[in-house]
């Protein structure tokens, strides 16, 4: 019988917990929380992402199959679908946005010398957006067309290592040009845009 740490626990061991706790405290994420902490929520959503879960029911069922190993994955108790849904609906999203920016700042220097296929010493960025279709009856706050809802994900990608350095989510009608004002240009860097 294998006695080592589970792979998920090994991956989560790299999470800077002190930074995560600072983000949670800064945005009041643990206010009125009794048992399902922000860290539990993060573990559940990270598990869902890494195991390609597609719904809350899918996450709950997959975690339930782990039984006694759930503790070894980092969870303090079983994750209920309703509890996870409430946490996703009420917890400040800024916690996870700030954590993502911190993790990106750690990852970028690791790929600073990665070749990009073109002999340039300068940083090369690619800026693009993708439209994510949503159901209009479920997301009425994101109208896109008369029968459809959507949001747009604008991303600035550092081509060395393919690491996003800027991510902005807007309504589906926002053109990429309107987001350019939110970018802080880096002197000497090259920026690639499509005509979108």
Identify the role of each PLM range.
Residues 1-196:
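Conserved, well-structured functional cores that handle cations and Mg-NTP chemistry
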């Amino acid at each position: 019988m294998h006695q080592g740490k589970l792979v998920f626990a090994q991956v989560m061991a790299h999470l800077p917990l002190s930074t995560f706790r600072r983000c949670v405290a800064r945005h009041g994420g643990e206010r009125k929380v009794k048992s399902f902490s922000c860290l539990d929520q993060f573990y559940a959503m990270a598990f869902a992402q890494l195991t390609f879960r597609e719904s809350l029911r899918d996450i709950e069922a997959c975690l339930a199959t782990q039984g006694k190993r759930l503790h070894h994955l980092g969870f303090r108790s079983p994750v209920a679908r309703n509890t996870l849904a409430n946490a996703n609906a009420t917890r400040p999203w800024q916690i996870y946005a700030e954590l993502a920016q911190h993790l990106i700042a750690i990852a970028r220097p690791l790929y600073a010398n990665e070749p990009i296929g073109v002999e340039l010493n300068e940083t090369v960025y690619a800026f693009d957006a993708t439209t994510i279709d949503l159901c209009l009856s479920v997301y009425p706050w994101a109208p896109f067309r008369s029968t459809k809802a959507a949001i747009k994900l604008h991303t600035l990608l550092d081509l060395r290592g393919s690491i996003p350095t800027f991510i902005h989510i807007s309504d589906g009608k926002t053109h990429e040009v309107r987001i350019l004002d939110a970018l802080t240009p880096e002197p000497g860097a090259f920026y690639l845009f499509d005509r979108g």
